[in-house]
């Protein structure tokens, strides 16, 4: 958490398990290449985070000529043994000297929804305080105290381990009770109900980032 304490947060924060979304993107690529009969390139990271921000409640200015000054922070939590996401472009968390510099950490881009800023945080399953689930819970709780944060989008891996969702629910309930002005959205591959937050389907944003069009799968 020390890496995030001095950051001036914007109105929207996306907190994602990077290893999970990379794995889902891989499975979607394999399945849909077979289904539509063409090669699918790596997911466009910029396109994906813009779609996720829309899922979380961000909207473009009504006047297309108006500059959007909103900031969205994207926090990618990943295993410390992994250097990159294989199914996203760009996908390198922190570039080494010999790389071409296309890393995600501390980088930003601007688009119709404003500026997107990336932060990559490594986890370590061998240390309790650095386990991915703990980091996700801590980040979510931290955002509750950040007044300027109005929208939070959470993308955990609840498929591999049901304890992940169980550990997040108390924080989600706290946000729902004590910070009801914040819009919290959880993205998952399957519909969810009974959670103290909004839910959306993760697959839609990933398919858009992979360039799969609706007419191709009808």
Predicted feature residues:
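Cofactor-binding loop segments of dinucleotide-utilizing enzymes, especially the Rossmann-like FAD-
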Residues: 80, 157, 189-191
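Acidic, polar low-complexity linker/tail segments
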Residues: 1-10
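"Short basic amphipathic alpha-helical interaction patches in structured regions
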Residues: 28-30, 169-170
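A charged nuclease-like catalytic/ligand-binding cleft shared by nucleic-acid processing domains
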Residues: 9-23, 30-153, 162, 196, ...
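Acidic, metal-binding active-site segment of PIN/NYN-like and related structure-specific nucleases
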Residues: 152-171
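Eukaryote-biased recognition of electropositive, low-complexity segments
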Residues: 119, 167-218
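Short basic/hydrophobic patches in alpha-helices and adjacent helix-turn junctions
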Residues: 141-142, 159, 173-174
């Amino acid at each position: 958490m020390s890496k995030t304490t001095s950051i001036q947060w914007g109105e929207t924060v996306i907190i994602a398990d990077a290893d999970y979304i990379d794995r889902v993107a891989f499975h979607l690529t394999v399945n849909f290449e077979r289904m539509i009969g063409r090669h699918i390139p790596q997911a466009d990271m910029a396109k994906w985070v813009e779609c996720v921000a829309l899922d979380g409640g961000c909207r473009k200015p009504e006047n297309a000529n108006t500059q959007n000054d909103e900031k969205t922070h994207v926090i990618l939590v990943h295993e410390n043994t992994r250097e990159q996401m294989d199914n996203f472009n760009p996908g390198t968390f922190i570039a080494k000297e010999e790389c071409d510099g296309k890393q995600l950490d501390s980088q930003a881009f601007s688009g119709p929804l404003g500026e997107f800023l990336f932060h990559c945080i490594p986890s370590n399953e061998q240390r309790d305080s650095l386990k991915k689930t703990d980091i996700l819970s801590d980040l979510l709780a931290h955002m509750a105290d950040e007044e300027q944060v109005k929208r939070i989008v959470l993308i955990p891996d609840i498929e591999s381990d049901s304890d992940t969702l169980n550990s997040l629910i108390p924080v989600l309930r706290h946000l729902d009770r004590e910070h009801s002005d914040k819009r919290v959205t959880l993205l998952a591959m399957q519909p969810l109900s009974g959670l103290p937050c909004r839910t959306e389907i993760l697959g839609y944003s990933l398919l858009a980032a992979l360039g799969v069009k609706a007419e191709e799968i009808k």
